[in-house]
Amino acid sequence: MIKRVNKLVLGISLLFLVISIAAGCGIGKEAEIKKSFEKTLSMYPIKNLEDLYDKEGYRDDEFDKNDKGTWTISSEMAIQKKGEALNIKGMVLKLNRNTRSAKGFYYVNAIKKDEDGRPQDNQIEYPVKMVDNKIIPTKEIKDDNIKKEIENFKFLVQYGNFKDLSKYKDGDISYNPEVPSYSAKYQLTNDDYNVKQLRKRYNIPTNKAPKLLLKGTGNLKGSSVGYKDIEFTFVEKKGENIYFSDSLHLKPSEDK
């Protein structure tokens, strides 16, 4: 009887040890993911995008010796009301630190499904450039609404603030060392600063508070290969989606 009790106690102790180790690994990986994103998110907000010409980023062997790199920033808002198309509006801008010039495009998309249920991409792009911190079209645009949207567009990096990132707790952590890929998801409230900023700038048709998703691929300690994206997911279900995504990263320049 005593031996059985001792074995039971030993088994329970080992179980608690395994759980503790697993929990510790999860906490450690969460801290690593946060640290990896903090390198970039600590730069937010950058009200004057031209400041990026003088900002350093992570560099590795993928960069030529004399290449300062190109910052690529993107932000998009996607809204799909129940039973309707997924409507997306966003912008991509590449700031070349060598030439101190920036160009990109504003885009709109309405993704619908055809008769066979396959999504049909209908993206329209409007080329833009940045001059004196102002984004302007490089070709004539007849649609006044599109022109106004481009004129008023702001990237999250210009108004977002992640100083409270370290305070986000109990995230849903995922890590695959083989890819490698990683993510951390946190439930936010509508009182969160960035959520308020998004609601201020976009007509978001839900009162649900979003989840913040930090996701990336490549070496957690830093890599110019792969990506790091952040996403605010308000609604995610079949036939109905509302999310905002954003990214900022330094890549080797295509034209030096």
Curated annotation (Swiss-Prot):
Family matches, as InterPro entries: Csa, Csa_sf
Lipid attachment of type N-palmitoyl cysteine occurs at which residues? 25
Q: Which domain of life is it from?
A: Bacteria
Which residue positions does the secretion signal occupy? 1-24
Q: Which UniProt keywords apply?
A: Cell membrane, Lipoprotein, Membrane, Palmitate, Signal
Which Pfam families does its entry note?
DUF576
Specify whether Acetylation is a keyword of the entry: no
Q: Membrane: present as a keyword of the record?
A: yes
Cited Gene3D superfamilies: 2.50.20.40
Q: How is it placed in the membrane, per its record?
A: Lipid-anchor
Localization in the cell: Cell membrane
Q: Where is the lipid attached (S-diacylglycerol cysteine)?
A: 25
Question: GO CC terms for this protein?
Answer: plasma membrane
Family classification: Belongs to the staphylococcal tandem lipoprotein family.
Query: This protein is called what?
Result: Uncharacterized lipoprotein in plc 3'region
